[in-house]
Amino acid sequence: MAAPAPGAGAASGGAGCSGGGAGAGAGSGSGAAGAGGRLPSRVLELVFSYLELSELRSCALVCKHWYRCLHGDENSEVWRSLCARSLAEEALRTDILCNLPSYKAKIRAFQHAFSTNDCSRNVYIKKNGFTLHRNPIAQSTDGARTKIGFSEGRHAWEVWWEGPLGTVAVIGIATKRAPMQCQGYVALLGSDDQSWGWNLVDNNLLHNGEVNGSFPQCNNAPKYQIGERIRVILDMEDKTLAFERGYEFLGVAFRGLPKVCLYPAVSAVYGNTEVTLVYLGKPLDG
């Protein structure tokens, strides 16, 4: 079983492909950085609480004292203040981020959420920053990728539908080249060699336009229930994609993934349905 672990480094920012997702390393300086390095941690924390993520990332590289001050407590005032400034009130007030253990983890999840610039024209990302809404457009399948993809490391995220599935509702991964919109109602994820998907409606695994069997591999597998959180586990070391449901490990769905940048992705067909995706970080085996 996999569970999220707090990030060891700074929350990732920007868009594109991430490596192992470990974040910034400890400052290269051998000691304190002048007078600033000798400031008490509580004073540094107060100063850091006014900075933005990119500035905090630079501060973490100054010296080991600053790095420890930033990353010693993931619920410190630094991360709480940044969380309050960066995330929508709805995301913090509701249970969207209930499985994230710290303010820092919540910021990291936001950095890895759906991209507003890398989705079908028929969907939009709601103000909470984590939920996709599909407009009621006839004869169209619409998808979205996250802001950051992965070429290294192990990563976990949760996905759940908050509306009807329709005839096709697919979760999985995609390269940057995979299309995020097409005509008709089809399994967009898995329709070519650039994406891999699990259709929650009929439990089929899809890749390269073909059905790769049913999933999970058991008799009378239960159907997906609206609101049920599915955990997706991408292992770029073993080149596998696996799924969990309710902390039950369902098995490895895809093996032999290519060594390219892969993005969490979904595709939907039902009008006004909504899909939420939350990045959890590195999974722990248990």
From Swiss-Prot:
GO molecular function: ubiquitin-like ligase-substrate adaptor activity
Induction: Down-regulated in response to DNA-damage. Induced upon influenza infection.
InterPro entries given in the database record: B30.2/SPRY, B30.2/SPRY_sf, ConA-like_dom_sf, F-box-like_dom_sf, F-box_dom, FBXO45-Fsn/SPSB_families, SPRY_dom, SPRY_FBXO45
Keyword Nucleus included in the entry's annotation: yes
CDD domains: F-box_FBXO45, SPRY_Fbox
Residue(s) carrying N-acetylalanine: 2
Superkingdom to which the source organism belongs: Eukaryota
Subcellular location, record wording: Secreted; Postsynaptic cell membrane; Presynaptic cell membrane; Nucleus
Pathway: Protein modification; protein ubiquitination
Keywords: Acetylation, Cell membrane, Cell projection, Developmental protein, Membrane, Neurogenesis, Nucleus, Postsynaptic cell membrane, Secreted, Synapse, Ubl conjugation pathway
Gene Ontology terms: cellular component: cell projection; cytoplasm; cytosol; extracellular region; glutamatergic synapse; intracellular membrane-bounded organelle; nucleoplasm; plasma membrane
Domain B30.2/SPRY: 92-284
Acetylation in keyword set: yes
Any Pfam family: F-box-like
GO annotation terms (biological process): anterior commissure morphogenesis; cerebral cortex radially oriented cell migration; cerebral cortex tangential migration; corticospinal tract morphogenesis; DNA damage response; neuron migration; proteasome-mediated ubiquitin-dependent protein catabolic process; protein K48-linked ubiquitination
PROSITE patterns referenced in this protein's UniProt entry, alphabetically: B302_SPRY, FBOX
Residue span, F-box domain: 33-82
SUPFAM superfamilies xrefs: Concanavalin A-like lectins/glucanases (SSF49899), F-box domain (SSF81383)
Function as written in the Swiss-Prot or TrEMBL entry: Component of E3 ubiquitin ligase complex consisting of FBXO45, MYCBP2 and SKP1. Functions in substrate recognition but also plays an important role in assembly of the complex. Required for normal neuromuscular synaptogenesis, axon pathfinding and neuronal migration. Regulates neuron migration during brain development through interaction with N-cadherin/CDH2 after secretion via a non-classical mechanism. Plays a role in the regulation of neurotransmission at mature neurons. May control synaptic activity by controlling UNC13A via ubiquitin dependent pathway.
Subunit annotation: Forms a complex with MYCBP2 and SKP1. Interacts with HEY1; leading to FBXO45 nuclear translocation. Interacts (via SPRY domain) with CDH2.
Family named by the database record: Belongs to the FBXO45/Fsn family.
Entry protein name: F-box/SPRY domain-containing protein 1
Species this chain originates from: Homo sapiens
